[in-house]
């Protein structure tokens, strides 16, 4: 099965990861301890309930070192599985599989952790109509993968980068002199999507009048957020953001906002407890 993500070169990612891990000397432990013709079978499993993300990427690490490896995928990305579930079965050259083990586990643990935390947030707002968004708070070089993981968890992607929409924040406003002036400048530059961060109710009308197409309601408590949504009255999408946790997100969603963005689903997700056990054939 071919795995493809726009703007992501999986082969280059795998090669760079191995270059970092192997250096010039290679896997000296496996070379010394494991005879060249030894074959292994292995099972990747989870020790906790998780949402899957990144299994095709883990497979790519094994196939890069053993193109003839046999891999049986037992679940698919986006699936929710219980503790003890087997994820992959593989059989191939022992040295290659041992060398690829840690990079493969690193990425699948990281991405499953993101997908699992994301699903907790999505479940918390079920039935409210609000949509969970991720943010640009990602590890440099891993954004495409991390945003893929949030999608597997049920979120939608916010901006992929600075290029795909204007987002006017407090520092832009400070330089421009006002919210309205910052929005006018973005509109004059021909930018179609203009997201404006506001943290006070009196900023809403000036932002809308100047041409904002989306309002980010930053760090507002529930009562102020509800009032802000009423003031906007559906003229543009609204987005709650700022310090939102699994425990507080539902109250924010019930104010009627269109979106809720949460940085911690990528920034603070713990790695999933996933392991890989091998045995000689």
Predicted features and spans:
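Cys/His-rich Zn2+-binding cysteine-cluster or related metal-binding knuckle/ribbon modules and their
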Residues: 246
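Acidic/glycine-rich phosphate/pyrophosphate-binding loops and surrounding catalytic core
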Residues: 2-210, 223-231, 237-239, 250-259, ...
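Short beta->alpha hinge that forms the Motif I/post-I loop of the SAM-binding pocket
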Residues: 220
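Active-site loop ensemble at the mouth of alpha/beta enzyme cores that anchors a bound cofactor
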Residues: 275-280
């Amino acid at each position: 099965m071919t795995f493809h993500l726009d703007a992501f070169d999986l082969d280059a990612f795998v090669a760079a990861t191995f270059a970092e891990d192997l250096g010039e000397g290679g896997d000296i432990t496996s070379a010394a301890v494991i005879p060249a013709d030894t074959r292994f079978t292995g099972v990747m499993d989870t020790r906790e309930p998780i949402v899957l993300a990144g299994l095709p990427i883990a497979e790519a690490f094994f196939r890069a070192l053993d193109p003839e490896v046999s891999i049986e995928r037992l679940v698919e990305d986006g699936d929710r599985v219980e503790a003890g579930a087997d994820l992959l079965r593989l059989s191939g050259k022992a040295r290659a599989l041992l060398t690829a083990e840690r990079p493969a586990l690193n990425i699948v643990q990281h991405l499953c952790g993101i997908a699992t935390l994301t699903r907790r947030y999505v479940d918390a707002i079920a039935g409210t109509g609000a949509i969970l968004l991720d943010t640009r708070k990602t590890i440099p070089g891993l954004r495409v993968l991390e945003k893929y993981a949030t999608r597997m968890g049920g979120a939608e992607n916010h901006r992929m980068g600075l290029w795909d929409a204007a987002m006017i924040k407090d520092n832009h406003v400070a330089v421009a002199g006002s919210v309205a002036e910052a929005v006018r400048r973005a509109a004059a530059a021909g930018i179609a999507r203009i997201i404006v961060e506001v943290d006070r109710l009196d900023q809403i009308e000036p932002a809308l009048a100047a041409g904002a197409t989306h309002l980010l309601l930053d760090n507002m408590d529930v009562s102020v957020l509800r009032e802000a949504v009423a003031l906007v009255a559906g003229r543009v999408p609204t987005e709650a953001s700022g310090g939102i946790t699994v425990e507080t997100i539902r109250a924010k969603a019930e104010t009627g906002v269109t979106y809720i963005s949460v940085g911690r689903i990528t920034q603070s997700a713990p790695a999933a407890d996933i392991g890989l056990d091998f045995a000689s054939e």
